[in-house]
Every structure is written in C-alpha cells, then in structure tokens.
Amino acid sequence: MNEPKKTERPLLLGLLVKKFKAEGTPYIHFNWGRISLVLVVLIAFAWISMATLLFAYFKYVKDFDKVKFSNMMLLPIKYSEHKIEMGDRHIERGLQAVDNNNFNDGIRLLRLGLIRSPGNLEGLVKLAQLYEFGLKRKDIAIEMYIDGFGHDGINNKEFCIAALRTMLRNKMDTEIITIANEYLPKEFKKGDNPNLQTIAYAAATSSFYRGNFDKTEDYIHAFLLNESVDGIILSAKVSWDRGNKFSAIKKLESSLYKFPNSDELYSQLCYFYRKIDDFDSARRYAQLRNIKSPSNPNPIIDLIYLYNKYGIEDEVIKYSKQIIKNFSDNEIAIFQLANFAASTGKINIAQFCYELALEKDYDLGNFALTLVEAHISTKDYDGAVTFSEELLLENPKWLQDQWPIFSSLRALASYGLNRPDLGEIYLEEFLSEPRITSETLVAVADRFTANQMYQQAQKILDFAYTNDTNNQRILNNLIKVNLELGMTQDLGDQIKKLLQTRRPDKELLRDAYNRLGSDLFIFTKNRNAILMELGAILRD
C-alpha cells in the first residue's frame, strides 16, 4: 500500500519552506524572494524609525526647529549640508533674538550656529560686535574677524568693512598689514573686486599711523584710492605730516571740483586752516559746509568752536541760538551744544540746553552733567556743588546709572573748594565702579588735568593704565602728567613703550626730551639711552 505524498509546509511566515525529496526525506528551502522582501521592509522600517528619532533629536534636543524629515532620511550622504543648514537656522534665530533685545539667547544661538556654519559671515559680524561692544572682549572679536577672512570674507563687503574698522579702531596694524600681504594682488584695475580697495585703504591707514608714509602712498596709488574722498584725505594727511602743509591743502581744494558736496573735504579743510591759524579760510570753509548741508548741525557746531577760539562772543551766541532754533527737536545737536558749553564754561548755554532737555523729555542725565561741568570749567565750584546737591535732593532715576561720572564731578568741585577730604571720598567712589570704561577714565582725568589737579589725574590714569596697558591715549596722558609732577619711577619704561606705539605725539616727545635733560629727572631709568633715541627721532 503506497504512503500518501507529503506536501510542502511553510515555516516562519513563509520565509522557509519544509520540502521533501522523492524518497520522502525532508529538507529546508529558503524562500529568498520573500526573505529579501522582508529584509527590505525591515531595513526601510529601521531607516524610517532612525530618521524619525533623528528628526525628534534635532528638533527638540538640538533646537533646530526647521529640520526636514527628508534630510534625516538621507543624513549619511547629506550630513555636511544638514550641518550648515542647521547652523544657518541657529544664526537666523540668533539675529532675531538680538533684534528683540534678547541678548543672552541671541549670543547662545549665534555661537551654536557659527560652530556648524563658520562661513555665515552675517552671523560672525553680529557676534563679533556683541563681543566687542557688549561683552567688552575685543580680543575675541578681532580673532573672529581674522578667522572670517579664511571663509571667503574677502568677497563680502559688509564683513570686510566691519572687520577692518574694528582692527583699525583697536590699532591692530600688524594684523591688517598681514591680511593685505596675503590677499592684495600686485596689480589692480577698475572693475576688480572693490573689497580689495577696502583692504588697501585699511593697510594704507595703518602704515600712515606707523609713520610709513612711502608705503601709505604706494597703497594709495596702486589701488586707485586717490579717486575716493577717503583716499584723497589720507593722501593730504601724509603731505601735512611731512610738513608740506600747502600741498596738503591744495590736494583737498582741487578735489572739491570732483566732489563739490563732500562734507568730509570741507571739514578737513576747516581743520587744516584752523591748525595754521588762518581764521578767514577756516571760517569760509565752515560756512560753505553749512550752506552745502543746511540740515546738518555739525558745521554750525564747528563754527561755534571756531568763533569761541578767536574770542568772537557775538558769533558764538548767534550760532548757538541758530542751533536751538533750528534743531531743538534734534537731541544729538542740542547735546553737542551742551558739550561745547561744558568744555568752555558757557553756563548760560548749558543751563538753556538743560531746560530744553526737560521740556523735550530728552535723556536728562547727560544734560545735567554738562551743566555741572560747565560750572567747573569756569571754576565756579560753588555753583557746581549747589546744583549737584539739588540733583541729590530730586534723586532722579537717571542718577544711579550716571553715579560714577557724577561722583567724579563732585570730587573735582570738592578739590576746587579746597576740600580734599570730600574730594578723596568721591574720587574713590568713582574708581570703585566696576563698569567704568577706559574712555571714561581718560575723560575724567582730562578734567582734572585741565584744572591743574595733576596728582588726582595721575591717580586716575595710573589706575586706567593698570587695567588697559595697550591704550595709547592713556599712556600719552600718563606720561604728560608724570612729566608735570616730576615722577621718575616708571617714566623710563613708559616712554620706551610710547616709542613703540602708533605715531607717537611729536610734541610730547619733544617735551619729554627737554624735561629729561634737566636734573629733576636724573634718576629716570635708562635716561641717557632714551634721550639719545628721542633726539634721533626728533631730528628726522
């Protein structure tokens, strides 16, 4: 009797099939078609699952709100593109946060974005500005700008301007020249990348500040900088500093035919004529500047300073009234007039500006302080103290923010009234303020110097120099004060450092040379060597 025929039996959902040979022996057959299909389905499921996890990870953990699921599906082959896209989105959100005054979140997002997209120069510029002006870390800002040139910064106008302005402002002349040597071609013609001219102008300016006039003129001619107002003015400054004052003025005057509406040319001509004490020419160009730009208060402010210098009081009053009449709604213009009054002791003008600020709801703190300073400038220390006490009684909201400057003015007035005990208290109060900037310290020291209070000025400048040893203005003023006081302890080292800075002030060098030769400074460190070096510089 024959056994019934054994049939196939599917196993594992049909992935395997149990079959039988002719003699009835079973064996396993792999259903490769179905296995392949299942593997494909599993791989697809795993791929989609992983893409889903990555999507959630980047969206919710890495804060990438515009992540695309399609990019997650192809992440292994699109990772570089995804990384840059993610960085750009963080930078976009960071810029929005900064615009909304959310600086902490903005800085965080910008930093995250630049890690992933270092070539996003808009984000780099914004973050560098926050470091320089907000966090007072100009060293980090400069390093970022230098790195930015390696990310095609040479082809980005906004980046080049921001980077080179910051480096010029912070006297990074060596770094600017290095960038120029790396990126500037040997020849330049019209139609070439205009950013090359921006770099050339920065390099020419750095060379000028370092006293390398030949190199400055090489940049000006090679990169056609003398076809722009900035280049013409720089060329004129080179001629002026070489002693060719007539040539410098001629360069500017001849350029007025090409640039008849250039406010910068008129302003520079007015400055040059003031320096050579040609009042009529200085006044003419200041008035022409005013005619060319009637809506600009700056030419009128220049005229006010000019007439004040030559003691023409009627014209000072006339143009001051013109500012008040035509620009009373312009807070900056009124504050410029208040600053003039503060520096020249025009108490009536300062008082009027203060009252106008009250009426117009301007930033009252600045105007109040200029009125205090106006009293001090004319040595009306009683008036300064009286007005200060009135402010203390009123205790306005702005006073807390302006307290350091307010304390410095009270110190000045107290010393002026021969109350050094109070003066010392207020001065220490001023110096103990942690937020105070180098610029503020220098400005306050200048006020003490102007009132012949050299010991107090020296104390402020010494404090400022300790915290900002590379600030040339602080160093200049500290040397001047030490020369006045006959302070020899650190004077030698300070003068040596001054000689290594940008275009040291020739008048200061001459004063130092004359004074160091006297017996009062016989114990100055390296005195003879410094005198020889100063003598050589002054003979050139």
Residue locations for each model-derived region?
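Calcium-binding loop positions in Ca2+-binding modules
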Residues: 103
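Long, contiguous interaction/recruitment modules in multidomain scaffold/adaptor proteins
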Residues: 2-83, 191-195, 205, 209-224, ...
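Primarily low-complexity, compositionally biased regions used by nucleic-acid-associated proteins
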Residues: 1-2, 351
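Alpha-solenoid helical repeat scaffolds
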Residues: 58-60, 84-99, 110-114, 123-540
